[in-house]
Amino acid sequence: MSHNVTPNTSRVELRKTLTLVPVVMMGLAYMQPMTLFDTFGIVSGLTDGHVPTAYAFALIAILFTALSYGKLVRRYPSAGSAYTYAQKSISPTVGFMVGWSSLLDYLFAPMINILLAKIYFEALVPSIPSWMFVVALVAFMTAFNLRSLKSVANFNTVIVVLQVVLIAVILGMVVYGVFEGEGAGTLASTRPFWSGDAHVIPMITGATILCFSFTGFDGISNLSEETKDAERVIPRAIFLTALIGGMIFIFATYFLQLYFPDISRFKDPDASQPEIMLYVAGKAFQVGALIFSTITVLASGMAAHAGVARLMYVMGRDGVFPKSFFGYVHPKWRTPAMNIILVGAIALLAINFDLVMATALINFGALVAFTFVNLSVISQFWIREKRNKTLKDHFQYLFLPMCGALTVGALWVNLEESSMVLGLIWAAIGLIYLACVTKSFRNPVPQYEDVA
């Protein structure tokens, strides 16, 4: 019995419709630039008012991993992302476990975004049952993803542009306030980056929290099979998404830090967005921004929905998941329809699910993917392809991915205990499932050979 799934020339495949700009917009929508207002209070408290520097540290750390993604996308332009890279570069067993763990990140991300939207709606319209909002939003998200990835990309492009415009408007009000004497009282200051009471360790601690603001930049690697010239476009898109997102975070928090030099004005620093809107722009603007925040989390949910459906499609095509369901592509829409519907059904759990638990699941999956993408570069290029002869080889295929792995290691150290426990339980379930698929590992792990 063969356990390698060979390509079928008559099978329905995903349609290539995306170019660089839509892919970057998908990544930025996933990241949600507006999240900078949510995390500002807690990180400002941790760093004694040096949030921009913490973001700079986080950006540098993330860019190492972004470079690793770029190298592997050129080698394996498949929709499977970290799953495919670990499968081909290290081993099919490791690849499955990475893919299984990554499902925690991707599978629950749409639900978390719907859950956040539900929370916003409950604050705006408490008289309407929240389950109605959840069902309506999930139906909208699923319908868009079913029809085409291009429509999702177009929707997300509009939302990202509007987010940037809204951030610019808020920053305009912040600048005006500082100019009129609020906060630091000056627009030119090095204090948001460094001051006499600055300490590196708290900034690194803040950076570990802010790194999770970048979660999602990697998800666009799942769009490789629907992107024209993916070997060139996807690596650039991944790097640009992380870089542009990071620059927005640093630029915006510089001015916010001038307006709020410390956290003394915040009643609840852990949920600073509503208070920032209230202090800077007033009650009416706060309500409007809350409504728009609902739309931004929906856009992020749509991007996550698209990504996980394609990861499940690749795992189904490989045969590690039932192929007839997970490997199905709709003949007209050319989308993984069954997976999209399944993810939509899981997102309905937002009707009654704990946000803290869902977030814990996501963090574990993201760190597994980041770690093994960096290790896959070393395994594939430095070890397997023996690109270890020159100083340039050592720098590109050993030093840079090692830096990426070490920076991710700092995130592992700061991972919540609940994330680790839930993640390990999920990994154990995956290992048991894999043992069943391979008949106690006597048979090889199924894999699709078209990408090698």
Curated annotation (Swiss-Prot):
Catalytic reaction equation(s): putrescine(in) + H(+)(in) = putrescine(out) + H(+)(out)
A biological process term (GO) from this entry: amino acid transport
Localization, UniProt: Cell inner membrane
Pfam families: AA_permease
Periplasmic topological domain: 38-48, 117-123, 180-199, 259-283, 416-417
Activity regulation annotation text: Putrescine uptake is inhibited by carbonyl cyanide m-chlorophenylhydrazone (CCCP), which dissipates the proton motive force.
Single GO MF annotation: solute:proton symporter activity
Membrane topology, as annotated: Multi-pass membrane protein
Stored InterPro entries: AA-permease/SLC12A_dom, APC_superfamily
Keywords: Amino-acid transport, Cell inner membrane, Cell membrane, Membrane, Symport, Transmembrane, Transmembrane helix, Transport
Topological domains, Cytoplasmic: 1-16, 70-95, 145-158, 221-237, 305-339, 382-394, 439-452
Transmembrane segments annotated in the record for this chain: 17-37, 49-69, 96-116, 124-144, 159-179, 200-220, 238-258, 284-304, 340-360, 361-381, 395-415, 418-438
Domain of life: Bacteria
A GO term from the CC aspect: plasma membrane
Chain's role: Putrescine importer. Required for induction of type 1 pili-driven surface motility.
Family under the similarity heading: Belongs to the amino acid-polyamine-organocation (APC) superfamily.
Name of the protein in question: Low-affinity putrescine importer PlaP
Species in which this protein is naturally found: Escherichia coli (strain K12)
Lineage of producing organism: Bacteria, Pseudomonadati, Pseudomonadota, Gammaproteobacteria, Enterobacterales
Gene label: plaP
